[in-house]
Amino acid sequence: MITAEKKKKNKFLPNFEKQSIYSLRYDEMQDWLVQNGQQKFRAKQIFEWLYEKRVDDIDDMTNLSKELREVLKDNFTMTTMTTVVKQESKDGTIKFLFELQDGYTIETVLMRHEYGNSVCVTTQVGCRIGCTFCASTLGGLKRNLEAGEIVSQVLTVQKALDETEERVSQIVIMGIGEPFENYDEMMDFLKIVNDDNGLNIGARHITVSTSGIIPRIYDFADEDIQINFAVSLHGANDEIRSRLMPINRAYNVEKLMEAIHYYQEKTNRRITFEYGLFGGVNDQIEHARELAHLIQELNCHVNLIPVNHVPERNYVKTPKEDIFKFEKELKRLGINATIRREQGADIDAACGQLRAKERKVETR
């Protein structure tokens, strides 16, 4: 729930007349009900309507009194976004472009795997991290999303899956934006979707990825939550990583690795390193050896990413044979590594591409 204190801490949060009902954690809903003269147990009924029955209107919550429904309508909205574009790939990947209440647009992607359906969610409108290979940063950062706007992305995808009696089985927070720059709303989102009364998606089926906001890595390590953790690394030395990710100038590789070691010591959980391969930049055998040396003491996995071409960027794809050689060298050196399967190559698949193509309000 967005409080005055939260708004003071997070200047990039929106200032809507009514906040999303999906922004409330279960405990916050209970507290709000009591503060408004209602019975605490109504929280369970409301969450059932929101996350199990997935109604679109507060008036559809028929086991609530008319008085309570009116109070809810006076204080909250259920409409946080509308679908503007829905692109479906030959491989079943679906990319959604949503328009928010203030006209900004965000992307969400449904990816189908043998093991289930994964949703990639966005945490910010735009991004200020400035990765030189990413379309998401082209328009800069406009604002942070409320927790409810992040929840609504998953719910909208789930409602689409309801038509074929499927369910969202995994969530990855790897869409537009840097999750750790919207930390409190991201944490509320995680608690809502993980809650037994919410979407009840297991913590081990949710992954958060960061570009390396070091103070927040320490905070995340201290959270009592079993969420999977990934780091966008892309370079094993400061020269290459700073070229690809300017944030490395503020949080260099040495300091980043110190934070990652702290995280693993505190949580005893495996870490995933996202490593995009860029032709002629970071994709040679010597780069694989340098990467292996950097992470050899960690319980980790390397996810090698054949990068999607972004028209506004100049990077080229690494040839397939070089990708396989890179993976083979990591494995020879004892590093667990896999190559990410390319999905949605025919539908503006790179993060931020669809939004960049359709963006109107943001570019005024």
UniProtKB/Swiss-Prot annotation:
Keywords: 4Fe-4S, Antibiotic resistance, Cytoplasm, Disulfide bond, Iron, Iron-sulfur, Metal-binding, Methyltransferase, rRNA processing, S-adenosyl-L-methionine, Transferase, tRNA processing. Binds 1 [4Fe-4S] cluster. The cluster is coordinated with 3 cysteines and an exchangeable S-adenosyl-L-methionine. S-adenosyl-L-methionine binds at residues 177-178, 209, 232-234, 308. It is an enzyme of class 2 (transferase). Gene3D superfamilies: 1.10.150.530, Aldolase class I. The active site is at residues 107, 351. [4Fe-4S] cluster binds at residues 127, 131, 134. GO terms for cellular component: cytoplasm. The keyword Metal-binding applies. Its cofactor is [4Fe-4S] cluster. Residues 113-346 form the Radical SAM core domain. Its EC number is 2.1.1.192. It holds the Pfam family Radical_SAM. GO terms for biological process: response to antibiotic; rRNA base methylation; tRNA methylation. SUPFAM superfamilies: Radical SAM enzymes. Its main location: cytoplasm. It catalyses: adenosine(2503) in 23S rRNA + 2 reduced [2Fe-2S]-[ferredoxin] + 2 S-adenosyl-L-methionine = 2-methyladenosine(2503) in 23S rRNA + 5'-deoxyadenosine + L-methionine + 2 oxidized [2Fe-2S]-[ferredoxin] + S-adenosyl-L-homocysteine; adenosine(37) in tRNA + 2 reduced [2Fe-2S]-[ferredoxin] + 2 S-adenosyl-L-methionine = 2-methyladenosine(37) in tRNA + 5'-deoxyadenosine + L-methionine + 2 oxidized [2Fe-2S]-[ferredoxin] + S-adenosyl-L-homocysteine. GO terms for molecular function: 4 iron, 4 sulfur cluster binding; metal ion binding; rRNA (adenine(2503)-C2-)-methyltransferase activity; rRNA binding; tRNA (adenine(37)-C2)-methyltransferase activity; tRNA binding. It is found in: Cytoplasm. Disulfide bonds join 120-351. Specifically methylates position 2 of adenine 2503 in 23S rRNA and position 2 of adenine 37 in tRNAs. Confers resistance to some classes of antibiotics. Belongs to the radical SAM superfamily. RlmN family. Reaction proceeds by a ping-pong mechanism involving intermediate methylation of a conserved cysteine residue. This is Probable dual-specificity RNA methyltransferase RlmN. It comes from Staphylococcus saprophyticus subsp. saprophyticus (strain ATCC 15305 / DSM 20229 / NCIMB 8711 / NCTC 7292 / S-41). The lineage of its organism: Bacteria, Bacillati, Bacillota, Bacilli, Bacillales.
